[in-house]
Design a protein with these regions (language model features):
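Compositionally biased, charge-rich terminal segments
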Residues: 1-9, 55, 222-239
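Soluble catalytic domains of membrane acyltransferases
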Residues: 4-199, 257-308
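Phosphate/oxyanion-binding loops and surfaces in catalytic or ligand/nucleic-acid-binding neighborhoods
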Residues: 92, 186-190, 215, 219-222, ...
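Long, charge-rich alpha-helical interaction segments
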Residues: 196-231
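Long, hydrophobic, amphipathic alpha-helical segments used as structural scaffolds
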Residues: 220-223, 251, 258
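Transmembrane alpha-helical segments and their cytosolic interface motifs
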Residues: 232-254
Length: 308
């Protein structure tokens, strides 16, 4: 079996299209502090996790055309065909205790692959909360990310750095919002353990989890504010734009109608950006209609909220 970090046929061309499609789902994607990501050595990325598969897609945008390997919960690998596609996408399965001891035991094979990635200077991205949470308040960070980093450092004998990343969604569920991605200063695992020499291992991991969560929360930042003035001019613009909105609604019917049907059948609305991405991925010729359709929809929604 080919190593997951190795170049494989079709990946880079597909990655360019994937990154372009991701950008079409948002009004803007602003990246700050990308220069803080080490360009060599063993690097583990630690973003907050808000929006299912959209979060890894935004990480790919952050890295441009460079390869990144991801960790994800093992239950989505149950179907062999899906597992094959996920591996092609450079995603590794990581089992949790709730999956049972037999599944957790398989993590050792995954850990070997992660360490192999780090040894070959391919970044590994792990969402340390363990699951997504469509809120600005993060869930508690799990210690697994630090265990992996410590294991890699012990086996490779090189510094392993964990990079905090904060992803700020203007809207967790609606399209064409603004995205802010901020990268923090790396945490070198050896230095972090040295600072806490004398503490029990459990206390070290507890402090590290708290610190990573605090760093990510600081990077996420506050909720983006918007203007509420010029109501008359905005109302006039809304009225004049209605013919364009109607054309765009009809033109993008094959995107927004399946999207609405799919999302109504899903309990977990955090998948909304992922489903929207899938529709854009399948129907690129309809971007010209769907992008202005969603932007106008947001414009009308904000206007109605301000006029109440």
């Amino acid at each position: 079996m080919a190593k997951i970090w190795e170049k494989h046929k079709g990946y880079l061309p597909a990655l360019k299209y994937v990154n372009l499609t991701t950008r079409t789902c948002f009004r803007s994607i602003r990246i700050e502090g990308a220069e803080r990501i080490p360009q060599d050595g063993a690097v583990i990325l630690a973003p907050n996790h808000c929006a299912a598969l959209m979060d890894p897609l935004l990480t790919l945008v952050l890295f441009g055309g460079k390869p990144v390997v991801f960790g994800s919960r093992s239950d989505i690998f149950a179907n062999p065909k899906v597992a094959k596609v996920l591996r092609w996408l450079r995603i590794l399965p990581i089992a949790r205790e709730c999956n049972g001891l037999s599944e957790v035991a398989r993590n050792f094979d995954t850990f070997k692959e992660i360490i192999d990635c780090l040894d070959n200077e391919v970044p590994f991205c792990l969402y340390a909360e363990g699951t997504h949470n469509p809120e600005r308040e993060m869930l508690p960070v799990k210690k697994g990310i630090f265990r992996i980093a410590k294991m890699a450092q012990d086996q490779l004998g090189v510094p392993v750095r964990i990079v905090p990343i904060g992803v700020n969604y203007e809207d967790f569920f609606r399209g064409q919002g603004r995205i802010g991605i901020r990268v923090g200063e790396p945490m070198e695992i050896g230095e972090e353990f040295a600072k806490r020499a004398g503490l029990a291992e459990a206390d070290i991991y507890r402090e590290l989890c708290t610190e990573l969560r605090d760093r990510d929360m600081a990077l996420i930042g506050p909720e983006r504010t918007r203007r509420h003035d010029r109501k008359f001019l905005r109302a006039l613009a809304a009225l004049l734009s209605l013919p364009l909105f109607a054309v765009c609604a009809v033109g993008s019917l094959l995107i927004w109608l399946p999207y609405e049907i799919i999302m109504r059948g899903m309990e977990d609305k955090a998948w909304s950006h992922t489903v929207r991405f899938a529709m854009h991925f399948i129907f690129p010729v309809l971007w010209i209609f769907h992008i202005p359709f969603e932007r106008l929809l947001n414009f009308y929604r904000h206007l109605f909220e301000d006029l109440k």
